[in-house]
Amino acid sequence: MSNRIYWHRCSGLNPFQIITSLRLTQPGQRLGIANQGYRRFLLVSSSIADTRELSMSYHPSTYLTQSGNILPSVDKGLCFEKLLETVFLSVGGCVRL
């Protein structure tokens, strides 16, 4: 069973502020990022503590890599696939579950 949370940009919202941060409850947690048929995997290092927050600035032309760097892509929306323990997402925007 997979749990997916889909985030979609809405008209009138600032695309840079759709996703602001996420918190991992388990070190080594893996999140799948999939958009428009493309799939990227964010494998968070086990050195990250349980309570550490990863800051994210999302734009349709960027995605977050394992090291936290923002690199170009063609993504236009985010799908986080919950593969392990609970992931808490802090967002500004509209959410469709």
Curated annotation (Swiss-Prot):
GO biological processes: sporulation resulting in formation of a cellular spore
Top-level taxon of the source organism: Eukaryota
Keywords of this entry: Sporulation
Name this protein carries in UniProt: Putative uncharacterized 10.9 kDa protein in spoC1 gene cluster region
Originating organism: Emericella nidulans
